[in-house]
From Swiss-Prot:
Keywords: mRNA processing, Nucleus, RNA-binding. It is found in: Nucleus. RNA-binding component of the cleavage and polyadenylation factor (CPF) complex, which plays a key role in polyadenylation-dependent pre-mRNA 3'-end formation and cooperates with cleavage factors including the CFIA complex and NAB4/CFIB. Involved in poly(A) site recognition. May be involved in coupling transcription termination and mRNA 3'-end formation. It comes from the Eukaryota. It comes from Aspergillus oryzae (strain ATCC 42149 / RIB 40) (Yellow koji mold). Residues 427-458 are annotated as: Disordered. One of its GO terms (molecular function) is RNA binding. This is Protein cft1.
Length: 1393
């Protein structure tokens, strides 16, 4: 019984779409990452302070994201009659023939599903000779006028979904009894369109009933559809389809040359009929895509592997060949630009502007190419292609693009599955001279110039695009196409989205970052996960860690310390203004104040002054001489005053910490003694909450003196449990009732929470009540002014904080709520416009963000009580402006930061190193920006915070949800990776593209010598490199195709039986499908050499120890047995070999295998191994040493196409996890005692689980006990033998996702399985999808208990307190048991990472 948990979601962008989605005037980018939907807004921001940008640039800001229980296959925009936001809707296509229509709901600040349509049960897909839907691609296209959408699925089926538009007859009818019956029974006339909506019949108006037609109904000759797209400028819905009557084939090119047709059909939605408008025949057979072009060009662009063909509305064609094969594969008339040598397979085409017809083309190599059309009025007379040179931004994209979106205003987004997705901008070189149209030089009748009439007609569509230096003819020659492209466009990068996919191989290595000072400098911080990521030129390494590592610069011991603060104060003689940030950083003294508890009621304040990286004791006799307990320390009046808030008084100091003012905390009206328990300080206000739950509000004047602010009756007479001040920069709180003139003056807000957990928001200084938020302690998904229903169960809250989260580009206020058990709830404020009888009313609501972080459970009752005391005394700490980032620090047993970037939602980033008692911002000119930390050992560390590199892509490091990721660019594709434990180095197998030429000395093929082509095919050429984890630089590069790289402990001497860690490399010589492959096994040792004095890190090199050429390609390697031998998969044999002293590899045992061995792995030290074949399933075998032999134990009879596999022991049970080629995960078990196993000859299928990702690696890892298991074992150590799983499986995928399979106990499985059923049936799923159907795999019924879905289970945490308790009671468990189960499956077992 296992559970699959997605630790990191997919990062590769598969689809993108630009549209006004959130509002009618918004500019949004919607991105699909396999099973993840993200909605971005485009924000124009100013240049970063201190940056190199001279002007503002657009940035992507994430609005919402959703984990979808389905795989997105396409996105299209639809303009409906009436949407809730006023913007457009999105039509999403999913795998297995599903469509979902969604819109933006401003009242929920999220998406709303209008309808769901599925065609997977259509009768047309049940034919025995039709492939399964999961094996077929699909095409979705929407009419530019949003009159209908067509969905091609199951190869030859076409679903048509009409939409209602103004003036259509569909708006007036189609609401009869037949429609109601169809909606109720989910049946259709020609299909199975299931329209599941929650709204009334009036809200079903956007669409009409869909119908399914075979493509043969349009034209009987459409037997092999290739691509289709709706066209622009037609009165009726009209689309063009690319198809052939016989299947295209490169191998049969001499018989099937130019067999492709392009036909344009117009649809009659009322009669469900079509009319053929035009048809173009004998098109090149390598055409694969139709791109509809908007005005002024119009028509369609047909893209082939070697050419581009344009077909206008009258059927006129223009074509251009971009490599020399265009003349060989087709007889179609086209312009010759074969000197470009472009490969167009899988390229992406996007328009560059709305005013001209220029197109951006990105081939799989990543280079940027410009496609231009020669226009004669509205007619296209020619096409030309121009590569953009590197100096004009032509090399910004490093790998293939998967999608594109035109965002307007000279901005284009390029999504990629193989590299980071990039937001591009382009500009035109400035000049005052018009440039004549240059496309004419590519036509035969070009005379070198144009008439004035032609020029004026072109200017209608060009505007000032061609306002560049005129073309100069030198010696009768014109500039090249490349220089021409650069003279028109300069491309630059505005923003990018992180992608760590595809992850091809992983290795675990030692981390060199130390978290201790001199006392524990020798202790490393555990392991780090290094993965090979990227494709082609974007290849590199990704270093991943579960938490934030901080580099210790200095440390000191300070006994009995309870808290630490820092204060940056300006010199007394210098006036530092509030707006002069640079002056503050240069002319300020940095003080560190450490509070030491001398008794239960007394604390001594020890003051240090920062000098360089050292803390020097500073004598401040007037600083807390009464040893009162310090609540908080901060600065006011532009860092001219230091304010120390004590329990009994507030003390104000000057720049040298001389006493300036004392303000008592007691109540002056009643003269009763009062004590401060919490405070909030934002210049110029100080809010103090006293022990009688009353509020004291102080304000500093221009001189720095504090005066009490007289509170209104409501604030003064109420009882408060928490207070927080916030300077409203965005105006979201003030905009509720303030005018535009008031926003600049009244931007300070005061948040107060009552004893019944009602949140009051006041504006300062007029103390106007802005909003009242009800039921905060219920923690519902949306906080509003309306009290929650059925709120019998509530959470005990201890603190609320309102602070900015974000980076220098985009920061936004968030409400953070902390509970008694140290749980955190993060809410984002938004304005909801409600339309009542009168004017529309704006209400302030708070949306709950997804939270997947559980606090650690401390062991023992005493530890829990002590932890609660720490939580009460050390509140959440607001950390602002750390390299432009704003975050919130949570102290305690689960320390970490709540962080957010402009392209990610708020998430918790744990701090590695265990317990942290207090933290404060620290900054000097010598060490830069960092923190000072107080840990459990009462050690005060000066830390260089790596947040500046972890949260900024400019340095190659990122924070990605609970993990930190550092990207190391290599510049080549990294296919294999191994960690050399003896040297501490990483050995990587890289590859790069190189041209393949036929050998001219081949005696069997003398005709190869006469080959005249200059456009050679490309193959991968491999090399080995050694990378240092200290500097992440390549230090050795010794070149055959690397198939496997492993680190093994091999026996290097037959006499002494000495063993040493070696790097074993398997290679293959593949020269074509008609020539047998050869291979070789290399054994290397990473040795130390004398480095170059200028580069001391270059002190390692690979030394060849052994080499063994073999027959057949070496496709997999593994260590086996206990004698230091290795097993080699070579061709159709698996041979166990031992390293001899002469460097040869002696075979000792073998086994014949199937076709192509993709995986060989041993259960370490047992001799049991799995041998997985790429097409013939998996074998379970064993190796014995006395005598040497290999034996077959069991087989997988399903003949799986194995991509990755590994063992997963669970107690006395042995499971094998197998990843197939259809994104499924199979759990097999070897159980010879089961009668179904035929005495152990068969591997039993226990469960099948659809991950939605193409899995690249499965790695068996040890599992550390989590805090809940440690607590149970401590309590029940003498009573019960607790069985804790010792193994887990780490999964990486091609799209960048990282998952974990964890074994769970019988009791936990029943509890979580029941919870999963409840969540599946009760919560609302995005796009109306069914998570149970998404994870299910069709089988013959032999599978047992299904694998649990951790991503679905964690949605229980986002529910309100009442719903959590209700669902937990239905499951028969309490909250603590469910949270303990969540902790076990959430990845906390990776304690060493």
């Amino acid at each position: 019984m296992q559970c699959y948990t997605e630790l990191l979601p997919p990062t590769g962008v598969t689809h993108s779409l630009a549209l006004p989605f959130i509002s009618e005037s918004a500019n949004n980018l919607v991105v699909a990452r396999t099973s993840r939907l993200q909605i971005f807004s485009l924000l124009d921001v100013g240049p970063r302070p201190g940056g190199i940008e001279e002007q503002g640039v657009p940035k992507l800001v994430l609005e919402r994201e959703y984990a979808l229980p389905g795989t997105v296959t396409d996105l299209c925009r639809v303009k409906l009659l009436n949407t809730k936001s006023g913007g457009e809707a999105i039509l999403l296509a999913f795998r297995n023939a599903k469509l979902a229509l969604i819109e933006w709901d401003p009242g929920r600040y999220g998406i709303c599903t209008i309808s769901i349509h599925y065609y997977e049960r259509d009768d047309s897909t049940s034919s025995p000779w039709v492939p399964d839907l999961s094996s077929c691609g699909s095409i979705l296209s929407v009419d530019p006028s949003s009159r209908c959408a067509v969905f091609n699925f199951g190869i030859r089926n076409l679903a048509i979904l009409p939409f209602h538009q103004p003036g259509d007859d569909l708006v007036m009818d189609d609401y009869g009894e037949l429609d109601d019956e169809r909606l109720g029974s989910h049946g259709l006339e020609s299909g199975t369109d299931c329209d599941m909506t929650k709204e009334s019949i009036a809200h079903r108006a956007p669409y009409s009933s869909s119908f399914v037609l075979p493509l043969a109904a349009l034209d009987p000759s459409i037997l092999h559809p290739i691509s289709l797209a709706f066209l622009y400028e037609y009165r009726e819905p009209t689309f063009g389809i690319l198809y052939s009557q016989v299947a295209t084939s490169n191998a049969l090119l001499h018989e099937r040359k130019d067999v492709v047709f392009y036909t344009v059909f117009t649809l009659d939605l009322e009669q469900r009929a079509s009319t053929t408008l035009l048809s173009v025949s004998r098109l090149p057979s390598d055409l694969f895509k139709v791109v509809a072009l908007p005005p002024p060009v119009g028509g369609a662009l047909l893209i082939g592997s070697n050419e581009l063909v344009h077909v206008d509305q009258a059927g006129k064609t223009n074509a251009v060949g971009v490599n020399e094969f265009s003349r060989q594969v087709s007889s179609f008339s086209m312009t010759d630009q074969s000197d470009l040598a472009l490969r167009l397979e899988g390229c992406i085409v996007e328009r560059l502007s709305e005013t001209n017809g220029d197109l951006l083309l990105v081939p799989t190599t990543g280079e940027i190419v410009l496609v231009k059309f020669r226009l004669d009025g509205r007619s296209v007379s020619g096409i030309s292609v121009h590569p953009i040179p590197p100096h004009a931004g032509g090399d910004i994209v490093k790998s293939a693009a998967s999608s594109s979106a035109f965002l307007g205003d000279k901005r284009v987004f390029l999504g990629s599955e193989d590299a980071d997705s990039i937001l591009l901008g382009w500009s035109v070189p400035s000049s005052g001279t018009k440039k004549p149209r240059p496309q004419a030089r590519h036509t035969e009748e070009d005379s070198g110039g144009f008439s004035d009439e032609d020029q004026s007609e072109d200017d209608v569509y060009e505007d000032d695009l061609y306002a560049t230096v005129p073309e100069v003819v030198v010696d009768g020659r014109r500039p090249s196409a490349e220089s021409f492209g650069s003279s028109l466009y300069n491309f630059r990068e505005y923003d990018r989205l992180l992608n760590i996919g595809p992850l091809k191989d992983i290795a675990f290595g030692r981390s060199f970052t130390s978290l201790g000072g001199e006392e524990n400098a020798g202790n490393d911080s555990g392991l780090e996960l290094v993965a090979s990521q990227g494709w082609d030129r974007s290849g590199g390494l990704a270093v991943m860690k579960r938490g934030l590592e901080l580099q210790v610069l200095n440390s000191m011991r300070t006994d009995l310390a309870s808290c630490v603060w820092t204060a940056s104060v300006a010199h007394m003689e210098e006036a530092v203004s509030k707006t002069t940030t640079q002056a503050e950083n240069r002319e300020c003294h940095q003080y560190v104040v450490v509070s030491k508890a001398t008794s239960a009621e007394r604390e001594q304040s020890e003051v240090f002054r920062v000098e360089g990286q050292e803390l020097r004791p500073f004598r401040a006799p007037e600083f807390n001489p009464n040893e009162d307990v310090t609540i908080d320390i901060g600065t006011l009046i532009g860092k001219n005053r230091v304010v120390q808030i004590l329990r009994s008084e507030v003390r104000s100091y000057d720049g040298d910490l001389g006493l300036a003012q004392i303000y008592p905390v007691w109540d002056e009206d009643t003269s009763e003694e009062r004590m401060a328990i919490s405070s909030s300080l934002v210049d110029p206000y100080v809010a103090i909450l006293r022990d009688d739950s009353t509020l004291l509000l102080l304000q500093a004047d221009d001189s720095g003196d504090l005066d009490e602010v007289e509170l209104n009756e409501q604030i003064a007479n109420s009882k408060w449990t928490s207070c927080c001040l916030y300077f409203d920069k965005t105006g979201i709180f003030s905009s509720i009732s303030a005018t535009s003139d008031e926003l600049a003056q009244n931007s300070m807000t005061l948040f107060l929470m009552t004893q019944d957990c009602r949140l009051f928001i006041y504006r300062l200084p007029d103390q106007k009540l802005l909003a009242i938020i009800e039921g905060v302690d219920c923690l519902p998904p949306v906080l509003s002014s309306e009290p929650p229903k059925r709120s019998t169960t509530r959470e005990v809250l201890t603190e609320i904080v309102v602070a900015d989260l974000g980076d220098s580009w985009s920061s936004f206020p968030y409400l953070i709520i902390r509970s008694r058990h140290d749980d955190l709830a993060v809410y984002r404020p938004f304005i909801s416009i409600t339309k009542s009888v009168g004017e529309p009313h704006a209400d302030l609501n708070f949306l709950k963000e997804t939270n997947l972080v559980l606090p650690r459970i401390t062991s023992g009752v005493e530890d829990q009580s002590s932890t609660e005391e720490v939580i009460k005394s050390v509140p959440l700490r607001i950390v602002s402006n750390i390299s432009g980032f704003s975050a919130i620090f949570r102290p305690g047993v689960s320390p970490g930061f709540i962080v957010r970037t402009s392209t990610s939602s708020p998430h918790f980033l744990g701090l590695k190193g265990g317990y942290a008692q207090s933290l404060s911002k620290f900054q000097t000119s010598e060490c830069g920006e960092g923190f000072i930390l107080l840990d459990s050992k009462v050690l005060c560390f000066i830390l260089l915070c790596l947040t500046y590199c972890i949260l900024s892509f400019h340095t190659g490091c990122h924070s990605y949800y609970p993990w930190t990721i550092q990207q190391i660019p290599i510049g080549e594709q990294v296919d294999h990776l191994a960690y050399s434990s003896s040297s501490g180095m990483y050995v990587i197998g890289t590859s790069h593209r190189t041209e393949f030429k036929l050998p001219e000395d081949d005696e069997l093929h003398p005709e190869w010598r006469n080959e005249m082509t200059s456009f050679f095919p490309e193959v991968q050429r491999s090399s080995l490199k050694v990378v240092s984890p200290k500097t992440w630089t390549v230090i050795d590069s010794p070149a055959e195709h690397v198939m496997a790289v492993k680190n093994m402990s091999l026996e290097i001497s037959e006499n002494t039986h000495e063993r040493k860690d070696m790097i074993v490399v398997g290679t293959a010589f593949a020269r074509g499908e008609d020539i047998a492959s050869r291979g070789c096994v290399y054994v290397f040792e990473v040795i130390k050499v004398v480095p170059d004095p200028k580069r001391p890190e270059m002190d390692r090199k690979l030394r060849l120890v052994g080499k063994e050429p073999v027959k057949g390609a070496v496709t997999a390697l593994s260590e086996i047995g206990g004698q230091g031998f290795l097993i080699v998969a070579q061709g159709q044999k698996c041979i166990v070999r031992g390293l001899k002293e002469d460097g040869s590899l002696l075979p000792v045992a073998f086994m014949d295998v199937q076709c192509h061995v993709s995986v060989v792995k041993e259960l370490k030290g047992t001799g049991m191994c799995i041998i997985a074949d790429a097409v013939k399933g998996l074998w379970f075998a064993g190796y014995s040493e006395e005598p040497y032999k290999m034996s077959l134990f069991a087989k997988d009879l399903d003949y799986l196409e194995v991509l990755a596999a590994d063992f997963l022991p669970d107690g006395n049970k042995l499971f094998i996890l197998v990843a197939d080629s259809d994104c499924n995960l199979h759990v097999l078990q070897y159980d010879p005692e089961d009668p179904k196993s035929s005495n152990g000859d068969r591997l039993l299928s226990r469960s099948k689980f659809h991950t939605g990702n193409f899995i690249s690696t499965l790695t068996l890892l040890p599992r550390t006990s989590v805090s809940s298991e440690q607590m149970i074992s401590d309590v029940d150590a003498m009573d019960v033998d607790i069985k804790i799983p010792r193994h887990q499986m780490l999964i990486t995928s091609q799209n960048g996702s990282v998952g974990l399979v964890t074994c769970v106990s019988e009791e936990s499985y029943r509890r979580l399985s029941a919870l999963q059923s409840q969540l599946t049936n009760t919560i609302e799923h995005p796009c109306g999808l069914n998570p149970r159907a998404f994870r299910a795999v069709e089988s013959d019924g032999t599978a047992g208990r299904g694998m649990l879905d951790g991503k679905l289970l964690f949605q229980w945490l986002d529910m309100s307190k009442q719903r959590k308790v209700e669902i937990a009671s239905r499951v028969g468990a309490n909250e603590w048991e469910i949270k303990a189960d969540f902790e076990a499956i959430s990845g906390e077992g990776l304690g060493y990472l």
